[in-house]
Amino acid sequence: MATINLTSAEFEAAVTKPGITFVDFWAAWCGPCRMFAPIFEAASEKYPEIQFTKIDTDVEQEIAAAAQISSIPTLMAFRDGILVFREAGALPAPQFEELIKAVQALNMDEVHAEIAKQSNNNEND
């Protein structure tokens, strides 16, 4: 599966659906973005069950601002609608591979329990 270019209007639907979605915030003038692009594209071919999306921050400034993107590339990973990873900077291929496997291996019951626990703690503050 090839990468998908997202617009601001498509972002929420893409990241809230079941499964795993990676979002690469990038720009054409960004050297590290251009270095990471083939790594991201290769992963999209290797893992067709995962959605790999890209957002051009120059074109989609509204969503870049809403997502508080201050440095590019910034990579986000969502699983079942929950942001589980966010980091600025281009990952080397081996690290990106490790990240993909880590997101796949997440126990989402534990993630949901931790979110509920944090929510309860915030309500009790």
What is the role of each PLM region?
Residues 18-22, 35-55, 61:
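Conserved helix-turn-beta segment immediately C-terminal to the redox Cys motif
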Residues 3-21, 61:
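A short beta-strand-turn-helix
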Residues 71, 77-110:
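Non-catalytic, surface beta->alpha helical segment in thiol-disulfide oxidoreductase systems
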